[in-house]
Amino acid sequence: MIVTTTNSIEGKQIEQYLGLVSGEVILGANVVRDFLASITDIIGGRSGTYESKLAEGREMAVQEMVKKARNMGANAVIGVDLDFETLRDGMMMCIATGTAVKLKE
């Protein structure tokens, strides 16, 4: 499955647009992790804990989006956009959206 942020795929012709597809994931961060991450942020370093959480959320959201696209009969997702939102109580939401398409073989 081809997944791209562009609206077309070089060398490929879109046979059919199947519609909007998305994957949503909500992840929680625990209090100890938040505390340690805040110490890292205070001393000026990067928060590896949060970076890995972001990467995990992104990957899970994209995987869910791809699964839904396959179920629609797609062999590619174009125009992919990723969005991250922080929710209360240390929760984070990751959303991947795109257009499921069928490419000519």
UniProtKB/Swiss-Prot annotation:
Gene3D superfamilies: Hypothetical protein apc22750. Chain B. Coiled coil: none annotated. It comes from the Bacteria. It holds the Pfam family YbjQ_1. InterPro entries: UPF0145_dom_sf, UPF0145_YbjQ-like. Belongs to the UPF0145 family. PANTHER family: UPF0145 PROTEIN YBJQ (PTHR34068:SF1). This is UPF0145 protein Aflv_1588. It comes from Anoxybacillus flavithermus (strain DSM 21510 / WK1).
